[in-house]
Amino acid sequence: MNKITNNVTIWIKPKTVEKKWYVIDAADRVLGKVAVDVVRILRGKHKAYYTPHQDLGDNVIVINASKVRLTGKKYQQKLYYRHSRYPGGLYSDTFRTLSERKPCAPLEIAIKGMLPKGPLGRGLFRNLKVFSGSEHTLKAQNPVKLEANLER
């Protein structure tokens, strides 16, 4: 406690925070801009008591992930790499082939790359649910549709 101002730092515990559910529609929006807004909510940066080393963020449902948009020639040229962990087992997919095989994967990969690495990031990624269509199975959570700050 500071003797001059009598300020005390308040530490919020993750168990005491009530997590809300938000729905974000990714249709006809740029992949990176949607991912930035999703990560901001997952990390809790929109809250006044944001702490970087704790999971104080909210849960996010992303719908229409298969209709996300890319700029330039990235639809044909952007590459995603994976490895089978065997010698010579490096595989690459373009955005087009990956989105045909797994429609939600490009958005999930973009979001996962923006989250912190380690146990905190894995826990935050579990708060994300991505659906390729316009319907989701989490209506019981009463999610709030989020429209703000998605188009810059």
UniProtKB/Swiss-Prot annotation:
InterPro entries: Ribosomal_uL13 (IPR005822), Ribosomal_uL13_bac-type (IPR005823), Ribosomal_uL13_CS (IPR023563), Ribosomal_uL13_sf (IPR036899). It comes from the Bacteria. GO terms for biological process: negative regulation of translation; translation. Keywords: Ribonucleoprotein, Ribosomal protein. PROSITE patterns: RIBOSOMAL_L13. GO terms for cellular component: cytosolic large ribosomal subunit. GO terms for molecular function: mRNA binding; structural constituent of ribosome. Signal peptide: none annotated. Pfam families: Ribosomal_L13 (PF00572). This protein is one of the early assembly proteins of the 50S ribosomal subunit, although it is not seen to bind rRNA by itself. It is important during the early stages of 50S assembly. Belongs to the universal ribosomal protein uL13 family. Part of the 50S ribosomal subunit. This is Large ribosomal subunit protein uL13. It comes from Borreliella afzelii (strain PKo).
